[in-house]
Regions:
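NAD(P)+-binding Rossmann beta1-loop-alpha1 motif at the extreme N-terminus of oxidoreductases
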Residues: 1-81, 138, 142, 209
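Rossmann-like NAD(P)-binding element
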Residues: 39-45, 57-149, 156-160
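A short helix->loop->beta-strand "cap" motif at the edges of active sites that frequently abuts
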Residues: 31, 143-147, 169
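Short, flexible turn/loop "capping" segments at secondary-structure junctions
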Residues: 27-28, 114, 179-184
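Rossmann-fold dinucleotide-binding core
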Residues: 125, 148-233
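NAD(P)-dependent Rossmann-like dehydrogenase/reductase catalytic/cofactor-binding core
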Residues: 2-8, 12, 30-31, 201, ...
Length: 425
């Protein structure tokens, strides 16, 4: 049995939006010290301000509603109930005030100083393998020998990240499936080839302790590595369909703005970060299939430094109130195109097929677990909910689509075509 009480000092590598969000839930979990480490002092100052604002927003129902006024889901939550629940707001449910919590936050530009007494470290930097390997090599030298070293990556191999750490048995993947950790539920835990069971179990207990405004965390421990884990693997593969649809629209004289106006929004991409999505697509391109090559628009935004909300511009321009869209009225030729070309069942079929591949590859053992992970991560039904009865029809559709689109990666796998997934309940 692992003892969570041994985790007293917590460190986060990276002071961006994601790192700040992780630090917030770590502080609310009640650790004695939480350190945010970044090379840039200005980023650390912004991180401290953001963390304090987000914690202050949980002090009362009034502040909560004001802070989340533009969030269509959170603005309708029963905050009185949430504010009284440790699972929702952590130690604030025990009347611990913001000042006391913020006094436990440390910021540091020197990695060696920031992790010298850390019991648990989470890395939340850009999705670049070389950068992560460099950080984990340093963590292996600077942190105590018992420290668990976690990466928030959803894309990259934990085995490769751990190679230079000098302690691959202590390295795990711990991925928040959200860009705002206090509002997410799903956390996916991933082993590397040499990760110990004790490290995985401790990581899982740490993950379950993180508060969420939606209540108790749902943690999934994968049996083995998979690019994208569960939720992002399905999402990234599904993006192949929307990339194809965008190209078809362009060839039909329909602008991206028209598609955006017709509810094919890129807002989530701006929130996640154009750079993050670009690096993920490149990793899939190099490690899964060349068909995941980043599309032209994403590539242009990446090289222009338009990384989304965090820099004020991506697919949209952003201000404090959100994206500035100024979209045109939807034209008839756009609605006609969508009615003729867009088939949501193809997207569902792609997700079902990729979920079946996860079972075939032994990444997870149960289709019900995949469905639950998708539900908890996206608040949408998982692929098997309808796929259990429509897999034959969807397999035929997907076979045809893979042929006309030239995307052979999307061909239905044997498990999807036969329905054998039903044996993996």
């Amino acid at each position: 049995m692992v003892d969570l009480k041994k985790i007293k000092n917590f460190a986060v590598i990276g002071g961006g939006i994601m790192g700040s969000g992780i630090a917030q839930v770590a502080l609310l979990s009640g650790y004695e010290k939480v350190s945010v480490i970044d090379l840039n002092n200005e980023i650390l100052e912004k991180s401290r301000t953001l963390i304090q604002q987000r914690i202050e927003a949980l002090e009362s129902e009034e502040k909560c509603k004001e802070f989340f006024a533009n969030n269509d889901i959170l603005k309708n939550l029963d905050f009185k109930k949430k504010l009284a629940s440790f699972e929702s707001v952590g130690i604030m449910a025990n009347n611990v005030d913001t000042k006391t919590i913020m006094d436990r936050l440390c910021t540091e530009t020197d990695l060696s100083k920031g992790v010298k007494d850390a019991d648990f470290v989470i890395e939340a930097v850009s999705e670049m393998m070389e950068l992560k390997q460099t950080i984990f090599k340093q963590l292996g030298s600077y942190s105590p020998p018992w420290t668990i070293l976690a990466s928030n990556t959803s894309t990259m191999s934990i085995t490769k990240i751990a190679q230079k750490s000098k302690r691959p048995d202590k390295v795990i993947g711990l991925h928040f499936h959200t860009f705002f950790p206090i509002t997410g539920v799903l956390i996916e835990i991933t082993p590397g080839e040499k990760t110990s069971n004790e490290s995985l179990e401790l990581g899982r207990k740490v993950a379950q302790k993180f508060p969420s405004l939606f209540g108790e965390r749902f943690t999934v421990q994968l049996e083995k590595e998979s690019p994208g884990l569960i939720a992002n693997r399905l999402a990234i593969t599904g993006s192949l369909y929307f990339n194809w649809l965008t190209n078809q629209a362009k060839n039909s004289g329909i602008s991206r703005e028209q598609l955006e106006a017709a509810n094919f929004s890129s807002e989530a991409a701006d929130l996640i970060g154009i750079d993050t999505i670009y690096y993920c697509a490149k990793y899939f391109e190099e490690n899964v299939s060349p068909e995941f090559t980043p599309n032209e628009r994403l590539t242009d935004l990446f090289y222009a430094g338009k990384f989304g909300r965090k820099v004020g511009e991506g697919f949209y321009k952003w201000n404090e109130d959100g994206p500035i869209k100024n979209l045109p009225p939807v034209e008839k030729k756009t609605t006609d195109f969508i009615a003729k070309v867009f088939d949501p069942e193809i997207y569902s079929a792609i997700q079902l097929n990729e979920a079946c591949k996860l079972l075939e590859e032994g990444v997870v053992k149960s289709y019900e677990l995949i469905d639950k992970a998708i539900l908890k991560g996206t608040f949408m039904p998982g692929p098997f909910v309808v796929g259990k009865t429509k897999y034959k029809e969807w397999a035929e559709k997907l076979e045809k689509f893979a042929k006309i689109s030239g995307k052979s990666y999307l061909k239905p796998c044997a498990m999807m075509k036969t329905g054998k997934f039903i044996d993996y309940k």
